[in-house]
Amino acid sequence: MSKMLYTLGGWVARNRIKAICAWIVVLVAAIGLAVTLKPSFSEDMSIPDTPSEKAMDVIQKEFPHGPDKGSIRVIFGAGDGEKLTGKPAKKAIEDTFKEISKDDSVDSIASPFVTGTIAKDGTVAYADIQYKSSADDIKDYSIKHLKDSLKMADDEGLQTELSGDVPGAEMEIGGVSEIVGIILAFVVLAITFGSLLIAGLPILTALIGLGVSIGLVLIGTQVFDIASVSLSLAGMIGLAVGIDYALFIFTKHRQFLGEGIQKNESIARAVGTAGSAVVFAGLTVIVALCGLTVVNIPFMSAMGLTAGLSVLMAVLASITLVPAVLSIAGKRMIPKSNKKIEKQSTETNVWGRFVTKNPIMLSVCSILILIVISIPSMHLELGLPDAGMKAKDNPDRRAYDLLAEGFGEGFNGQLTIVADATNATENKAEAFADAVKEIKGLDHVASVTPAMPNKEGNFAIITVVPETGPNDVTTKDLVHDVRSLSDKNGVDLLVTGSTAVNIDISDRLNDAIPVFAVLIVGFAFVLLTIVFRSLLVPLVAVAGFMLTMTATLGICVFVLQDGNLIDFFKIPEKGPILAFLPILSIGILFGLAMDYQVFLVSRMREEYVKTNNPVQAIQAGLKHSGPVVTAAGLIMIFVFAGFIFAGEASIKANGLALSFGVLFDAFIVRMTLIPSVMKLMGNAAWYLPKWLDKIIPNVDIEGHQLTKEIQPEIDHEQKKQISV
C-alpha cells in the first residue's frame, strides 16, 4: 500500500490543478444536488421486535384510522390572572380557529371547548389541528398561515405554542460555537507550524472533504432513513479527523523538505509514509463505526454509516487533495532553519525524560485519576432526550412546559396501553374493565381513560397519564408495573409511548454494549498485536482504552445526569444519559485511540528495533511523535467541544463525551500511562513468542520499508539545490 500511495502522491503533486478541480467539481455537484433535493430526515428511533414497537404494530393493525394525516397541536396559555374560559379569551381562540380553517388543507380542528381539553384551573388548553395530507406533505404556506393566524390570540394577551408534526424544524449542521472550535484548531496549527498561511490549509482541505460528505448524507436521506443527529455527528467527526489527518501529512512533508528532499518527491514520500498511517487509522475508525450495524438497531446503523462516510471522505481528501495543496504551497512549506531550536530538539526531551524517570508515580496517578472520574458511571441512567431537556426559549420546550403547567408533568409522558383480550376466559368487556381497575390501583398514576375497544371487541386502548415526566425514574417504574399486570384474567397488556420506547431502546442497547465492546476490544488486541508484534503493548493499550471509556461515561453522568457544571456548559436541564451515547462513544473513541496508539508507539517500536533499548525507544516516540499527537488531540478536543454549545441535546451530549474522551485518551492514557507502564515492563513489553511471530503478517504501517526501497533512487536529489 505504501508504494501505491507513494505513486499516487507523486502524481497528484505533478497534476495539482487537475486534482483540485476534480474535488471542486465533486463538492459543487454534491452540495448542488443536496440543495435541489429537499432533505428528508427520519426521526424514527424505534427498534423492531421490542414490546413498545409490537404495541404500535397492533394499534395500526387492529385500530385502522384511514390515511395517515399530519396533526399539529396548538397550546393556549391564559394571561396573568385570566382564564381561557372567559369571554375575551374564548372569543380570541374561536376567531383564531375560524382564521386557521380558511386554509383548504385543514381537515378538522378539535376545539378544546368541545373536547374538554382544558386544564382544571382554566389557564391552559390545547387543540389538535388535523390536515388532509401527511405530516411530510404539509406545505410551508399552511405552516405560515397557521402561525399568522395565532397572532390574533397573541394580540389578545394569550400565549400560543405549537407541537406535533411541525415541519421546517431547523437543521443544525454548524453554528457560532463550532466556528470557535475551528478557530482554536487554527491557533493550534499556527503554533505547530509557525505560519498562519500553513495553519489554514489543513482546515481548508478538511472543510472541502466535509462538504462532500455532508452533501452525500443529505442526498442519502432521499433513499435511507437517516436522523438529523446523524448529519451533525458526521460533521463533527469528519471535521476533526479531516484536520488531524491533513496535519500528519503536512508534518511529514515539512520533515522531508527540511532534510533537503525535492518538493514533489517529498510530497510523494509523505503520502507514502504518513499517508499509509492515515489510511490505516481511517479504516480503523470506519470499521469501528460500521461495526455499529452489528447491534441491529436501524438508527444506530445509520449513524455509524454516515459518520463512517465522513471519515472516508477525510481520508480521500488527505491522500488526494492535500498533496495538491502542498504542491501549490511550494517553498512556503520549508521549515525555517533555527539552530537554537534544532539544538534544543536534539538535546532535550523534557516529557520523555520525565516519564521514564517517574514511571511508577505517573502510572499510579493516571490510573487513580481515571478511576475517580469513572465513579459516577456506577449510577448511569439511560434515556432519550425529550422537549423538556431543550433550551427554555426553544419552541418545543415552551410547548412542553405549558402543557406540564396545565395538565401535570405526566401529560408529556402518557402511556398508551394495548389490552389484548383474545384469550380472556371471562366477558371481554369485563376483562378490559378489570384491567383498567388494576392499572388505577398502581402507584404514581394520575389518570386512566376507560378502555376503547376495536370493532371486534378483542383489543382495547387504554391511556394512562403518570404523575411524573417521561424521563423520570418513577414513570419508568410505572411502565414495568403495568407490564407486570399482563396476562391477569387472560388480558395481555402491551405498553407504548415515549417512556416505554425509552425503556425498550435502553434495554436493547444495554444488551448490545457487551457484544459490541467485546468485538471492539478483541479487534483492537489482534490489530495491535500485528502492528507492534507484541502481546503486552496491545494488552496495556486495550486496558487504557477501557479506562478512557469508563472515565468518559463518568464525566457524562457527573455533568449531564447529575447536573454539575451544566450552567458552564450551557446545558438547559439535567437528565438521563443519551441511550445510544455509550455504544456510539465506544465506536468513535476506539478508532481515535488506535490512531494515537499507532502514531506514537510505532515510532517507539522503530527505535527499539534499531537499539534494543526500551527507555530510548519510549523517549524517541514521545519526542518525535508526541508533539503531533498533542496537536492532533487538542484539535479534536476543540472541534468536539464546540458542539457542546450547540442547540440540540443529543449533539451536546456527544460533544461532551468525545471532547473529554479524547482528553483522557490522548493525554492521560497514550502520552502518560502507556509509556509509563512500558518503562516498567522494559524489554518484556516487546516480547512475542517465536511461533506467533511466524504466523502473524508483517504490517508496515508508516511506510518504513518504502523509504528503504526508494532511498537509493533519490540520494542524488539531496545533493542538489532544492527546486521549488
Curated annotation (Swiss-Prot):
Keyword Membrane attributed: yes
Transmembrane segments: 17-37, 179-199, 200-220, 231-251, 277-297, 309-329, 360-380, 512-532, 539-559, 575-595, 627-647, 655-675
GO cellular component, one term: plasma membrane
One Pfam family of this chain: MMPL
UniProt KW keywords: Cell membrane, Membrane, Transmembrane, Transmembrane helix
Keyword Membrane among UniProt keywords: yes
Induction details: Regulated by the two-component regulatory system YdfH/YdfI.
Subcellular location: Cell membrane
Lipid bilayer topology: Multi-pass membrane protein
Stored PANTHER family: MEMBRANE PROTEIN MJ1562-RELATED (PTHR33406), MEMBRANE PROTEIN YDFJ (PTHR33406:SF13)
Similarity comment text for this entry: Belongs to the resistance-nodulation-cell division (RND) (TC 2.A.6) family. MmpL subfamily.
Descriptive protein name: Membrane protein YdfJ
Species: Bacillus subtilis (strain 168)
Gene that produces this protein: ydfJ
